[in-house]
Amino acid sequence: MAVGFSGLIVAVFFFTAIAGAQSVQTRSQALNAVFTDYWQDHLRHTPEDATVLGDKRYNDRWSDLSAEEIHRSVERSREYIQRIRAIDTAGLPMQDKLSAELLLRTLLEDQESVQFREWEMPVNQIHGIQFELPQLVAVIPFDDVKDYDNYIARLKRVPLLFEQLTADMKLGIDDGHVQPKIVSEKVLAQVNSIAAIQLEDSPFYAPTKKFPASITTDEQRRITGEISDAIAHDVIPAYQRFARFLETQYIPHGRADPGIWAIPNGDAYYAFCIRSNTTLHMTADQIHQIGLDEVKRDEAAMLVIANKLGYKDLKSFNAAIKANPKLHAASKEQLLDTYRADLEQMKAKLPELFGTLPKAGLIVEATPAYTEKQRPAATYEPGSPDGKRPGRVVVNTYNFAEIDLGGAESIAYHEGIPGHHLQFSIALELSGIPEFRKKKEYTAYTEGWGLYAEQLGKDVGFYQDPYSDYGRLQGDIWRAIRLVVDTGLHSKHWTRQQVVDYFHEHSSIDETNVQRETDRYIAWPGQALGYKVGQLKLLEFRQRAQTQLGAKFDIKKFHDLILDSGALPLDLLENSVNDWIASQK
C-alpha cells in the first residue's frame, strides 16, 4: 500500500511520540530504581532506622560504626551519584526531578561530612549510642519469640558497637578532632549513670516485664535469663569499658576552647554546618546580625506585656515570675498535664488550618531519669508510619519547680501539634514519593516549622493568658539568642561564659536551661541556627502568598503545600511556593 508524503510525516511523528513516551517511562523507572536501591541500602546499613520504621528484617544487629564502613559508605554514595547523573531528567514528572535533586544533595552532603571527619566525634550529650540504645528499646516490637531472640542478639553485639566507637574516637584524638572537655564529661556522666542502673530497673531489661500471651512460661523464663545474662556480661561491661576510655584517654585530650573553630579546618567546617542546617548560603556574620535584630524586636514586644501587667522593665517582671511559685510547676505530673491540655485545645483547631491530618496519635511522657540532666526542655519522637505507634512529646521534668509554666504552651505546639508531630507524621504517611523523602530531615525546615507552629498558635487566638504569651516570646527570643551565641561560639571565638552572660542579659530562662543550652550549642555547631532562619522564611512565604493572592489566599491550602511534599531545603520550598502562588491567581 502506498503512503503519501503527508502520511509519512504523521507516521514518523506518531512513532517518535511513542518512542519519546517510552523513553520518559524508561528513564522514570530507572530513576525510581535508584531511589529504591538507595533506601534499601540505607535500611540495611542503618538497622536502627529500620526498627523505628517497623521493618523487622535487621532487628538482630546494629549499624557498623567502623572507619572501614564509613569509607565503604563513601563508595556507595559515589555509585549512586553516578547513577543519578547518568539519567536525563528532561521531561520527567516534577516529583521525579525533585526527588533526584534531593537525593543528589543528600549524597553530596554526606560525602562532605565524611571529608570533614564528623564521624571521629560521634558522641556528645545530645546524640550518641550511650543513650540512643536504651531509647530504642522503647520502639522495638516484642510480638513473638523471634523478636526477643533478635533483641538478645543485639544485646550481645553491644560490645562490638562500643569497640568501633572507641576506635573512631581514637582516630579523632590523633587528628585533633575531639570534643571539648565539658562535653565529654557530660557523656561520661551519662555512661556511668546507665551502667549503674540495677538490672531490674535497666531500660534494657524492660521487655521482660510484659510478655505477649502467645509466649509460653518456659520460653519467658529462658528469654528473661538470656536477657539478664546479656545485660550483665555484655552490655554493662561495654558501658564500663567505654567510661574508662573516656575518663583515662579521651577527656585528657579534650579541647579547652568550646568553639568548633579550634579543630583543624574548623572555620570551613562551621561554614559547612551553617549550609547544612539552614540549607541556604549565609555567612556567620549575616546570621549573627539577624539574631541581634530579632532579640531587639522580641524584647520590645515583651516589654509591652510587662508594662500592661504593671512592671516598668523586663528585669523586674522576670524577677517577679521567678519569685511566684504559682507560675511554676508544683510537680512533674502537673507539668506533663499542662502540655496535654495545651495540645488538646490545639487539636480542636487543626481542621480549620490543615486539609491533611495524620493517622498517628500523640502522647506526652517524661524524659527518662538517666538522661534528664543533659536533655532539652522537650523533644519529639515520631510514631510509626502505619499509625499504630503514637508519636511522643517527651518532656524534661528535671528541676520542675524551676520551670515556668508560661513557656509550656509554645513548646507543646512546637514539639507536638501543629509542630513536629504533624509534620513528621504527614511525611511518613505520604504516598507517591520515594521512601527516603518521607524520612528526610532538614533542620531549617523541620525546626523552622516547629517555631512557625508556635507563632501559628498566636495567629489563631491562643496564648490568652498574658504569662503564656510572654512565655511564647521568651521561647522566640531564646531561638533568636541562638543565632547570636552559636555564631559567637563557633565563628567569633566567644567563651562559654560569654554565652551564659548573653543569656542572662537578654532572657529570663532558668539557670538549668541556660547551662544546658549553652553546652548544647557547644556540642552541636550550627544546628541551633535552623530554627529562627527557617521560621522567618516560612513567615516570609506566607506573607508573600497573602499579599499576592489577597482574598484567594487559603491557609489550609498553604499549609498543605508546605507539608505535603515532605521536608525540603528552603530554596526548593521557595520555588514550590512561588509556583503555587502563580497557579492560584
Task: Report residues per predicted region.
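Bacterial N-terminal signal peptides
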Residues: 4-17
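N-terminal maturation segment of proteins
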Residues: 21-585
